[in-house]
């Protein structure tokens, strides 16, 4: 392809385009309250993007060229300094070898194995403040705690997680095993109160226990303070529950029974007979008007349908239109030329183009031309 393109003018063209755009939008930006520094940053970003694309050679300002020259001069000096520093690092290990031979060995005695901590509970009230994570909730695992002698043989305790535990004396008589019982929803405080006669009645405040099996789920349960009686070696727990009856539902009327009417039926107005002539013809006129209105609606629908049919018809020369998909396929190529044309000649499958005032991107480089002539076959 013969053309009069000049690569030296490409950077000037791009720079003139950037300056024209920045100058044209400066007044608009100032009217909108945008600082002029934003325009300078936009211009710098535009130039950097153009240089990174490497589509234009020589697109550097005088200041940028000076910076590139200074950087090129500093690179040999940095390489020499790095080489000298690398030789100095290689000489250091030879000097430090004798010092490493004089190092002394220090023996560190092995630490004793840490013994497992023992949990000592001085009072039964402190069991309420224990962390629930330290007690295993599995049914097959029992937590063994060493309790003082002041704790009663059988006692129920509540943890922070709402779990009910029971203290049972083991066979050896030296340990107490906490067995998990049924969990409760809410627990507050267990205040043991001693009553005369050796009876200990812990008062459970705001404790919601699971429902007993004999009470239906629809019936409310009110939990009362439990009493634990000690008679020799036997223990008896007497729970006192009061079942709150469910609210009675209103009886539904039978299916065959009709409800009495709340209001008496309104009396119909008496009929007045017309004896002075024939009946009125207003109803016939109304029917005629309705028929005319229906006819008008049908005519309007037919007209609308005809118009819709015309719109659905394919317009003339529709095959000549270029769809969007074809437009995208045309630009899916590496080499692109945007220009105007003077003449195009065709002979069978050979084409000859006379182009002018264009810019093209070939093999990643941009070129501009005023006139160009090209041949093609397809």
Swiss-Prot record:
Main location: nucleus
Chain intervals with Low complexity compositional bias: 69-79, 89-106, 247-281
Binding site for DNA: 345-346
Post-translational modification: The alpha and beta subunits are postranslationally produced from the precursor form by TASP1. The cleavage promotes proteasomal degradation.
Sequence segments annotated as region (Disordered): 69-108, 247-331
GO molecular function: protein heterodimerization activity; RNA polymerase II core promoter sequence-specific DNA binding; RNA polymerase II general transcription initiation factor activity; RNA polymerase II general transcription initiation factor binding; RNA polymerase II-specific DNA-binding transcription factor binding; TBP-class protein binding
Keyword Nucleus found: yes
Cellular compartment(s): Nucleus
CDD domains (UniProt xref): TFIIA_alpha_beta_like
Biased composition, class Acidic residues, residue ranges: 282-331
A Pfam family reported for this protein in Swiss-Prot or TrEMBL: TFIIA
Source organism, top-level taxon: Eukaryota
Site (Cleavage): residue numbering on this chain: 276-277
Gene3D superfamilies in the record: 1.10.287.100, Transcription factor IIA (TFIIA), beta-barrel domain (2.30.18.10)
Residue runs in coiled coils: none
Tissue-by-tissue expression: Expressed in pachytene spermatocytes and spermatids.
Quaternary structure note: TFIIA is a heterodimer of the large unprocessed subunit 1 and a small subunit gamma. It was originally believed to be a heterotrimer of an alpha (p35), a beta (p19) and a gamma subunit (p12). TFIIA forms a complex with TBP.
Family of the protein in this entry: Belongs to the TFIIA subunit 1 family.
Name of the protein described by the UniProt record: Transcription initiation factor IIA subunit 1
Lineage, uppermost ranks: Eukaryota, Metazoa, Chordata, Craniata, Vertebrata
């Amino acid at each position: 392809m013969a053309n009069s393109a000049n690569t030296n003018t490409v950077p000037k063209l791009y720079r003139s385009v950037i300056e024209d755009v920045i100058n044209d939008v400066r007044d608009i930006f100032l009217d909108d309250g945008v600082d002029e520094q934003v325009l300078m940053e936009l211009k710098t970003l535009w130039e950097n993007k153009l240089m990174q694309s490497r589509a234009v050679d020589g697109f550097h300002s005088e200041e940028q060229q000076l910076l590139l020259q200074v950087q090129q001069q500093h690179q040999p000096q940095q390489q020499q300094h790095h080489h000298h520093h690398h030789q100095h690092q290689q000489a250091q290990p030879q000097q430090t070898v004798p010092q490493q031979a004089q190092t002394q060995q220090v023996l560190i005695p092995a630490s004793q194995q840490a013994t497992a901590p023992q949990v000592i509970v001085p009072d039964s009230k402190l069991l309420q403040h224990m962390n629930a994570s330290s007690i295993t909730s599995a049914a097959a695992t029992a937590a063994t705690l060493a309790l003082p002698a002041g704790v009663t043989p059988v006692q129920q305790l509540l943890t922070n997680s709402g779990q009910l535990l029971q203290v049972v004396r083991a066979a050896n008589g030296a340990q107490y095993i906490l067995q998990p019982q049924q969990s409760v929803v809410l627990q507050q405080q267990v205040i043991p109160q001693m009553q005369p006669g050796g009876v200990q009645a812990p008062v459970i405040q705001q404790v919601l226990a699971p429902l007993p099996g004999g009470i239906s789920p629809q019936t409310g349960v009110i939990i009362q303070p439990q009493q634990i009686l000690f008679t020799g070696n036997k223990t008896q727990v007497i729970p006192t529950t009061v079942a709150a009856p469910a609210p009675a539902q209103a009886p539904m009327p039978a299916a065959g029974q009709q409800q009495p009417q709340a209001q008496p039926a309104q009396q119909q107005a008496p009929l007045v007979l017309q004896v002075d002539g024939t009946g009125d013809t207003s109803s016939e006129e109304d029917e005629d008007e309705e028929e005319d209105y229906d006819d008008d609606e049908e005519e309007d629908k037919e007209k609308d349908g005809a118009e819709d049919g015309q719109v659905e018809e394919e317009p003339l020369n529709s095959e000549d239109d270029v769809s969007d998909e074809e437009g995208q396929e045309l630009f899916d190529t590496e080499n692109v030329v945007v220009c105007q044309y003077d003449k195009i000649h065709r002979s069978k499958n050979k084409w000859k183009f006379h182009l002018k005032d264009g810019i093209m991107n070939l093999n990643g480089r941009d070129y501009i031309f005023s006139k160009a002539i090209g041949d093609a076959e397809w």
